[in-house]
A protein has these predicted regions:
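Loop/turn elements at helix/coil->beta-strand transitions in domains of secreted/extracellular proteins
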Residues: 28-29, 114-117
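Short, mixed-charge aromatic SLiMs
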Residues: 18, 73-83
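Flexible loop/turn segments at secondary-structure boundaries
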Residues: 39-41, 77-79, 126-128
């Protein structure tokens, strides 16, 4: 938006939160954005906020452009390249991870249920994230096939 003020981190953050609150109807009062990349332990958002955002985008004019940026399962050069290989045509999602954190959010296009926005946020564990990625994949398969 153009409000004739010089751009800076705070005004940019305020604009993003204002857009999310007014357009996507997301309660941003408990949301914390610490950096623009999303790769910070200080970023805090909920699965509800993310799925609300995904639902809003799906109903918006940005739907096709946004979905085209998400990797599909088993697709080369994507974060799901080694995951959900046989479900590649049914899932478009983005991963996110840090030590002790494994997240997966996006859309499932189920032949049975149609499109479903989802967000699986798993954190607070020690050791390998593989069991959590396996659980996420099992949940996605259940959403696809019922």
């Amino acid at each position: 938006r153009n409000n004739n003020t010089q751009g800076n981190w705070k005004s940019g953050l305020d604009s993003v939160k204002s857009l999310l609150a007014s357009s996507a109807l997301i309660d941003t009062s408990q949301m914390r954005i610490a950096d623009g990349s999303g790769v910070s332990r200080y970023n805090l958002t909920s699965a509800k906020q993310l799925t609300t955002f995904l639902g809003w985008v799906y109903e918006s004019q940005y739907k096709n452009d946004f979905i085209s940026t998400l990797p599909g399962g088993g697709k080369r050069n994507g974060t799901l390249e080694r995951r959900l290989k046989t479900e590649g045509n049914y899932v478009k999602a983005k991963t996110g991870g840090l030590s002790g954190v494994s997240n997966l959010s996006g859309y499932v296009f189920s032949p049975r249920y149609g499109p479903v926005a989802f967000s699986l946020l798993m954190s607070g564990y020690r050791g390998s994230s593989q069991p959590y990625r396996n659980l996420q994949d099992a949940i996605i398969k259940q959403l696809i096939y019922g």
